[in-house]
Structure formats: C-alpha cells, structure tokens
Design a protein with these regions (language model features):
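Primarily the HKD phosphodiesterase
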Residues: 1-52
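Short, structured motif recognition centered on aromatic/hydrophobic residues
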Residues: 6, 66, 105
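Solvent-exposed loop/turn segments at secondary-structure junctions
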Residues: 7-11, 33-37, 59-61, 73-74, ...
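Residues that flank catalytic or metal-binding motifs in active/ligand-binding sites
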Residues: 42, 62-63, 90
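Short beta-strand scaffold segments in enzyme catalytic cores
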Residues: 65-68, 94
Length: 126
C-alpha cells in the first residue's frame, strides 16, 4: 500500500496502517515535511513501527492526498487523513479500480519516492 498524504493526524487511520504493517502488508508513506510537526501528527508513531516514510525537501507543499492499495485500487480526493475530515469537513473521495488512472498515480508516487530519497537529498546538498 502506497500512501501519499499532506497530513495524517487521525489515530484510527494510523492504527489501521500499523496493524496492516505488522501483518506483513508492505506500506510506504510520503507526507509533507512541515506536517511532521503538526499537532497530533501520527507519522512519528508509524515511523516507530518501522514503516518507511519520506518527506519533501522543499518549501513548497507536498499536497497530494491519495493511496494505492495492492497496485489496483486508487483512493483520491480532497480528504486529509484527519479526524475532522472524517467527522466534519466537506470532502470528496473517489475510489477506482481503473487501471489507466491507477497507473498514473503509481508513477507519481514512485517519482516522488525516488525524489525524496534522503540519500539523494544529501547528495544534492554536498
């Protein structure tokens, strides 16, 4: 499962990811660097679980909000992974198994995963 979200403060969603990871599901997460410090951020807990996490290295926002499940299902929309998004906000979320669309998002995730590789960031700074 590849997760690319701007912010993740919903403990329930983070707990689901942690349980899946403990059961052997491969999970990778990309999130916005500044959101690591957001109040209630669950990213640190997921890092402690051992889930690979990468963040952007730019002053610009990594503002995507999508997840790809088993390389077949795309979940995409305005939905931040927060309690407020679940319980109060006006949000949109589309779930599709359209292979053409899902492949586009898989390529975008992989591009960002490679771009945000901490080793490559270190190389650019030297």
């Amino acid at each position: 499962m590849d997760v690319c979200v701007f912010v993740m403060t919903c403990k329930d969603l983070a707990d689901v990811l942690a349980r899946l990871f403990r059961r052997g599901v491969k999970i990778r997460i990309i999130t916005d660097k500044e959101q690591l410090q957001a109040s209630g951020s669950q990213i640190w807990a997921l890092m402690k679980e051992g889930i690979p996490i990468r963040t952007n290295d730019s002053s610009y926002l990594m503002h995507h909000k999508f997840a790809i499940v088993d390389g077949n299902v795309l979940i995409n929309g305005s939905f931040n992974w927060t309690r407020q998004a679940i319980t109060g906000n006006q949000e949109n979320l589309i779930i599709t198994e359209d292979k053409n669309i899902t492949q586009l998002f898989m390529r975008e995730f992989q591009k960002l995963w490679e771009q945000y590789d901490p080793n490559k960031v270190a190389d650019r700074e030297t």
